[in-house]
Structure formats: structure tokens, C-alpha cells
């Protein structure tokens, strides 16, 4: 019996009960007290997140499977962000596929129909054959499940760094729609309701919550990875939505399996469950295996006795297993029986109140180098534009059916944000952002930066952010420097979210992301922001002769930038100036609404040069006068590659549009810095440089397909 509980925690349990727990009871406590389910090392700090707002229908609430935001006309969007990092490191196909399945079940547990997915993937450098194997199978797993179940992938991220060599990050966000008055809770409020389980229970995913709450130890943990079955998942999706108004609560059986799902659903009430009534995929499972199995495509419903028959008949019509396995009781005891014998009897007060930890912190010593490396300008441009993080993701997106369901407005990769249509006719933009290189330098500024970047990304299509879900991914929280990075990232995310008025309605924390030598990954907090188009949306367009206009002010803040990663760090990290971020984003949205611009791109990874790449790869050239870039430095390298926030590149076809932008700027810098040329794949710089980027553009289109062809 392998547990994630510490010896001190085991002693706490013994003292609370006044006895030695049975083996099955240890499994129950281990699942509910796991880091994965209890947030025991993070919850103290997560309380600083803003979770209330005029659009919040369901925020960060205990045991709710997803958050919800009001989008008008009686409709709500349901948001959830999850990961399957540890499973994907062992079995990338099933790890990624079941991550998609889990997020979809979280959405339908609120009675919402899933309409969009995002995937944010980080693996090690692709010169390593195992990393290529991981990437190919992760993408294949996502496509297998998403395509089979009919939910489009509308946006995402794909990035590479040696920090993820042993521990890839596979984040999936889901979005669904539901009438506000039809949202189903995940917890019960009364005793006497029947517990109805659908789906078969097998051996896969045994102890998955405990597995995700400790360091990876090797491929011998394959049994902790769940097996995906999207065709069963499609039945669960359709029938759950069909019977959602006939039940009192719905819960997906995710991390921790049956024991976690039912205990959280009880929300302090008692339960009595007969394990031998559970439909099994494998004969002769032990009670302990049944309790903590994480077999996929299973849901639990709280149902009034008189409605049990119609609920089960709906599933049985498709020959999908459905069974009444117990009921919620008036006491506070969590009881599981097997063939008439009680195998678990634990108080909910023990299970739902794990110890909370506030580990020691040690301030990370951030290095600031003010001596600029000797960098050749042309070499820098070519190195940045060839970097794998910036290449086309079409190889991945082409494996997803991103237009299924008819709600996709912009194809993935077409703009900085995904854009989907809602049932009320409104358009919703959604985007995920992380910046581990910056977080490794300063996790507080990184927390602020990623929220601001997500806000900018939405602005490029004409949308204003309305809410956030987050995922905080770090190493071992007991290591003081790691825990310091976590605490500081939370502080930064909380500050920026409050400032932008984008409450955090859900999230997840994933610790113990380390390589085989125990070295933690770069801190990788991730936010996914949703926003509503305010009036018009912008489909990016590029024309010869269009003016290239920079909105915002460039600063010599090179720390954590892509240039610094390649050539060596220098300068301080970007300081996120929230007022500039807000004003520049509002200016872009207003320009879109008034038809003043035809293209918008936020300046982030790769700086100005990175922001110009979408123009170059569409068969155009650019001419840039670096003297016209508003900046606090004369250093051309900094002007071209700084990644400080609050900045955009926009294109305009009329000269008077520039005057209009200046008149509406409210103190934000607006400057024409160049124009789009017809000379394909060429960048002209004022310094007399004509840089032919044909090779880099070809690399942009072909890199992922070629590197994964082995």
C-alpha cells in the first residue's frame, strides 16, 4: 500500500479516530488529503484571489467542479482548467486524452454543453527523441478524444524547454454554455437522496490522486494512468445533459475516484455506499481498488428516489451501466460496505479538513546583469524568428477538428485569441498565457505579467476580459525557494486580476513537477482568461503599404526575455504597469470598434521582432525605423527584443487613422514605426540592414512537421 501521507499525518489520523484505521480507510484518507485534492499547501494563499464580481455566477467554491460567468440574456459560460502532467509523462496518449475527457465531464457536471477546448502544452527540447515521442502522443491523444466527442480546440500554446524533459505539462481548459437558472450544483443540501453511479469501474487509474501528489518515480506507475474511451464519453455527455434537470447534484469522478467524488458531494452530510453494487469492468476487484479507481467516463448523480428510474433508463437506453449504490444520510459518517461488511467508517470532518501547511520560504536570488552581451543584430533577428516556441502550430491544430460544432469564429492561430459564438449571439474570446522564463527570474512580476498578457490578447480581437481560471505548476512545495516562487506568483496574479476586474472563478495547483534528479521545473503559473467582444471583432488582415503602428512604450527590460534566454541575461525584468496595460488595451478595442485598424498583435515573446512574424509569414515584408520607436533607450537590440508589456503592433490603411489613435490615446504612446512592403520575407531596418528571412519563414511553416517525422 503506497500512500502520499506523511508519518505525521498518519499520526494525526490515529489520534483523531482513537484507533488504527483499516487498510481501506487509509486509502480514503490518502486520496482526500492528497495535495491533488486537498490543496493543503496552497489554500491559505489562494484565498487572496478575487472571486467575486457582477458577472460571477459561481466562483471559487469548495467541491464545485467548475466556475461560471454571466454573459447576458440569461446565459452563463462555464470555465474549467485542468492538467494531466504526471499521467502524460508516463503514457502521453492516454494521459492527454483523459485530460480532455475529465475537463469535459467537469463542464457537463454543471449542466453545461461543452463548446470549446484549449490546450497548453510544454515539453522538453525536441532534439531529444523521448520528447518528440511525448509531443506526438500528447497531440494524438488530444485529437483522438476531442475529435471523437465533437468539441473543437480553438486556441492553445506549445512551448519547449529543457526544464520539462522528464515532466511535460499538459494543460487543458474547457468552456461550456448553460442557462443561468439551469446550472446544477456539485454538492447536495439534503439527506435521503440516492447515489446513482454510471459507468464501469476497472483497475486503471488506481491511486491517481496520490500519484499526482508526489514526485515521478518511473514508468512502473503506468497503472496510475487512466484509459480513455471517448465513445463512452460521448454517451455520458449527451445523457447527462438530457437528465440534468432531473437530478439534484452531479459530480465527475476524477482525482481520487469514488471516495473523493462522493465525500465532496456530501459536503458534510453522511453517506452509505454498498461497493458490491458498483458495476465492474474487471471481476474480483478488492474494496480498496473499487474505492480509489479512477476509471474514466464515470459520473455520480444525487437523485430523489422517485426519479431514479427515469435517470437510469436514460443511460440504459444506450446500454450504459447505471446503478443505485447508496444514499446520503443525516449523520456525518462516510461509510462504505462490501457484501454487508463495513470496510470504511470515517467522519466527514476528518476527511474534509486536512492539515493546512504554510511551508518555509527562501527568497530567490534573481540575477540582474547590466552588461549587454555582444549581439549581432542580424543573427539575433534570425535566431529569435527560428525559435521553436514561435513557429507555426498548424502541425498540431491540423490534428484537431477545430470547426466541429459551428461555434468557432477564428481558426486556432489566426489571431492572439480563440473566438467563439455564444447562443445569445455574442462573441466570446478566450486565451491561455504563461511565461516560465520570466517566472524563473521574478515570479511576482510574472504573475502580474501573464494576467496582463491575457488581457492584451483578448483586446486584439476586440474583447474585454471578464474572468479567469488559473493553474499553478511548481516543484516540491517543501523546498523554500520553490514555495517562495509559488507565494509570489499568487500575489502577482491576485493583484493583476483585481485591477482588471477579472475575478478568478476556478483553478488548480500542481506541485511536485520535477525531473528525475529532483530539479524543479521552471515555475509555470498559467491563466486562461475569457472576455466578451464589446462591439466588433477583428479578423486580422494584412495589406501592402499598411502603416505599422506601435501602441505603448518600450523599455530596456530584458530579463526573462527570449533574447536573454538565447544570448545571455541583461537588464532588469519587465515591470507590469497595470494602468498602461489597461489604457493601451482599451485603445485597441476602441480602434477595432471604430474600424481604424485591420490587424492587432500584442508584443510579448520575441519582442517587436516576434510580433512582426505573423506579417512576414503571410508573404509580406516589413520596413522599420527604430528611431521612431518610443523608448527609454537608444539601444536597438532592446527596442527590437524587449518584452515589456502594455504594447501592441497594429496596422492601419489610412494616414488619418494614426491621428485618430493619437487623439484617443489618453497618454499612451502611439507612433508609426514603419510599413508593410511587398518584398516577401524581408525585414528592412533603419540601420541599413536588409535581412532576408526566407529560411526563417520556411522553418516557421515546416519545423514541427519535420522534427516529428521520425
Swiss-Prot record:
EC number: 6.3.5.3
Binding-site residues, substrate: 83-86, 105, 226, 294-296, 510
MF term (GO), any: ATP binding
Keyword Magnesium included in the entry's annotation: yes
Active-site residues per Swiss-Prot or TrEMBL entry: 36, 84
InterPro entries associated with the record: PRibForGlyAmidine_synth_PurL (IPR010074), PurL_linker (IPR041609), PurM-like_C_dom (IPR010918), PurM-like_C_sf (IPR036676), PurM-like_N (IPR016188), PurM-like_N_sf (IPR036921)
GO cellular component terms, semicolon-separated: cytoplasm
Residues holding Mg(2+) 1: 82
Positions annotated to bind Mg(2+) 2: 106, 252
Binding positions for ATP per the UniProt entry: 39, 80, 470, 507
One Pfam family it belongs to: AIRS_C
Keyword Lipid metabolism on entry: no
Top enzyme class: ligase
Membrane-spanning ranges: none
Keyword list, A-Z: ATP-binding, Cytoplasm, Ligase, Magnesium, Metal-binding, Nucleotide-binding, Purine biosynthesis
Family: Belongs to the FGAMS family.
Function text: Part of the phosphoribosylformylglycinamidine synthase complex involved in the purines biosynthetic pathway. Catalyzes the ATP-dependent conversion of formylglycinamide ribonucleotide (FGAR) and glutamine to yield formylglycinamidine ribonucleotide (FGAM) and glutamate. The FGAM synthase complex is composed of three subunits. PurQ produces an ammonia molecule by converting glutamine to glutamate. PurL transfers the ammonia molecule to FGAR to form FGAM in an ATP-dependent manner.
Subunit structure: Monomer. Part of the FGAM synthase complex composed of 1 PurL, 1 PurQ and 2 PurS subunits.
Stated name of the protein: Phosphoribosylformylglycinamidine synthase subunit PurL
Gene: purL
